[in-house]
Amino acid sequence: MRSSETFPGDLRQRARHSGILAAPPSNSLRTAMNKVRASAAEALHGIRDGASIAAGGFGLCGIPELCIQALREMGVRDLTITSNNCGVDDFGLGLLLANRQIRKMISSYVGENKQFERQLMAGEIEVELVPQGTLAERLRAGGAGIPGFYTATGVGTVVAEKKEVREFDGRSYVLERGIRTDWAIVKAWRGDRLGNLQYRLTARNFNPLCAMAGRITVAEVEELVEVGAIAPEHVHTPGIFVQHVVVGKHEKRIERRTTRPNIVG
């Protein structure tokens, strides 16, 4: 894009109309582009009972703690949650489970949550178990506007029941649908006011995929940085996928700590 200094006054206006030269953003436009919200509750304003939500994280790593707590305090119910797991009894999505706010869970692993097991066995919650890689691809596909895809994972098991199975090059594949949700809640390391996000280490798990899958995405970040501080090649989720940004402190609880005895030679 050419600088305005290279255009004489009369040509500058014509260049802007033709799209050669962009007009500087107005104050109102800058305000509209600012996606930072004062709290998770403000960012989640408008969510209703029965909403579907994609929640990032893997175990307790990289989970959107602030949004989960806000949802608990808001008391919205009959939620359909898509997430790798359902947290533990007293943390993560387990808080919503204990509060009877989740109607259906689409997940890969639920073994760390005793409350989940109790509700499942009592028929109080609907569960759709999905192979982990398939769940990741369903979220990515939904965010990319792909309605479905074929995978060999799950063929010949309960995963493939009531789903279309086709053969390609002599091998069977099951049709899986992309996942699109009303909302997505994710957690990133750094973000800017335009919603560009950068994740750190293992927290870059299901978060980028969930951010794509949500029609409205709320991202909570540890650090808010100036636009441009995150190099383009380090932006993991472009701001086009994010509608709201919340800054806060996170407990980052360790799900399970294991140690290895020192080996003495």
Predicted features and spans:
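Intrinsic disorder
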Residues: 3-6
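Short, Lys/Arg-enriched N-terminal segments with co-localized hydrophobic residues
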Residues: 20-32
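Conserved alpha/beta enzyme-core scaffold
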Residues: 29-265
